Amino acid sequence: MPRLRLSLYGMTLMLLATPAIQAATVRLQLEGLSGELQNNVRLGLASISSDEVSADSRFQARLTDSIKKSLSALGYFQPAITFQTLPESLTTNNNVIKVTVDPGPPVKIAGTTIVLEGEARQDPDYQAWIKKGRPKTGTVLNQGDYDSFKNGFSSLALRNGYFDGEFKKSQLGVSVDRGEAFWDLDYDSGQRYRFGDVIFQGSQIREEYLRRLIPFHQGDKYSSLDLAELNRRLSATGWFSSVVASPDFSKGKASKVLPISTVLTPAVKNTVETGVGYSTDVGPHVKATWKRPWVNDNGQSMSFSTYLSQPEQQLDMSYKVPLLKSPLEQYYLFQAGLKRTDLNDTKSDTSTLAVSRYWENSSGWQKALNLRWRLDHYTQGTVTDTTMLLYPGVSVNRTRSRGGMMPTWGDSQRYSVDVSDTTWGSDIDFVILQAQNVWIRTLAERHRFVLRGNVGWIETNDFDRVPPDLRFFAGGDRSIRGYKYKDVSPRDSDDKLTGASKMATGSVEYQYNFTGNWWGAVFLDSGEAVNDIKQTDIKTGTGVGIRWASPVGPIKLDIARAVGDKDERGLQFYIGLGPEL
């Protein structure tokens, strides 16, 4: 084994000579070890504090015991340890305690006997654990691996319901003279417990709705993962402020069938949330939301929200009706809204009604059939009109993330098709296709990439009567930074924005975590909003920014400028709060 010289500068020891003489500084120097052996010895020595250090033989004995213990855990039982006390230099009163360690020959695995009894013999989780954890003959003994292997049996027992499991034998035999070690384990899992009836207590919701949320059946094999999923599904409804589902061992010990006691606390019937924010796109804004998470014992819920900013004011109402067959994944959503907009060259007053039928599958994809009605009175540029639309649509979307409010991994995808036709009473015919994607990936912990893409297409026989809310405008945050909010679109003869029938934008952003919750960012945004794809008008912006992963969500500040556009020479600043997905 290569002999490396390691100075532990972090351990400074004060040896008191006499009250009249200043204590000398002692530096501990460790030689002869490397890699995992060196790290484990250092970890053991870290428990010795400076005020416990002594220059006598008792300290050396304690040091020797610590080193031997650290090495034996990794299969080295016969180290040779020598000590030398040397002056650090001729000009100082400081000393160096030089500890030289020869780990000696290792003890290697000579054989393993692993016996598994009980119903766990047929459990693939146990079979996989044994296959993964059984050491190969001839490898150096690691007592930590042995302990972890044993603990894995107990962990699997709790997870898979072998609550009577126990080791009939668990021996780690070591022959130091022969340099051999033997694993000898005999584990009897006993009988696997099964799920009994789920008993709900304290619920204000009809029990048939709750039973549709249970992810297992009575008589199924017990799994703590399934029990956790029951807790998650009940919590996800929003009906309860507290959910505690746990097995009742007092009633299932003899039969090996565990009733599940589920104690529920109803959510507060009315909640009000208010918020004040600022974004560069719309300036300061205020939002207030009143929610009733449950209106009746069928689990129906409703909410009212209002949003106020200088360019946009909006009032929305929604009413959710969960379906008995699958209350969490399938439901109807009824919506109504009023909106007023005065932004750039757009002025509009909009009334909307909508009914949607939602499905969500186990992979996270949410599908919806929508039927929308809207009445818009608007002025866009120099055109003033009123349009009534009745249009069905289909949408699918999915959002995934890992890593909290500042995800290290995630993506958001949304695709939709909306169709209007004069056949059923709409003022105009159109087909609108849209796709939005955001992807977040992190490399080597500190390097984070955010990719965005948006595509939209309107096919219509009368574009001037398409309401501004349905037209495409680019520019601003989450679009093309370097341009003002919704300031990129075709213009009319008076140089006023008209909105576009085609849009495509993309963004590449790199973020670096330079300290704690702070990230620096550089980005490039590009895209266009046009009526004729043969006449491209690509706009590009680039810039830098900073991100703070605050307790209430990511807060960002970006500075960007347009590239190669003689009409856009100034800097644009963007301030935002909220999730990236």
Residue spans for each PLM region:
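C-terminal structured "cap/appendage" subdomains that terminate the fold
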Residues: G527, N531, Q535-I555, I559, ...
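Periplasmic polypeptide-binding modules associated with outer-membrane biogenesis and secretion
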Residues: A23-E36, A46-T280, T289, S303-V321, ...
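Flexible, surface-exposed loop regions and adjacent strand-edge segments
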Residues: L116, F200-Q204, T280, D349-A354, ...
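N-terminal signal peptide c-region/cleavage motif recognized by signal peptidases
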Residues: A17-A20
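Bacterial N-terminal signal peptides that target proteins for export
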Residues: M1-G10
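C-terminal outer-membrane beta-barrel translocator/porin domains of Gram-negative envelope proteins
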Residues: A236, H377-D385, L389-F514, V522-S526, ...
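Gram-negative/organellar outer-membrane beta-barrel architecture
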Residues: E119-P124, S223-R414, R441, R478-G482, ...
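Short, contiguous acidic/charged loop-to-helix segments that flank catalytic cores in large enzymes
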Residues: Q218, E273-S279, S305-Y307, G425-I428, ...
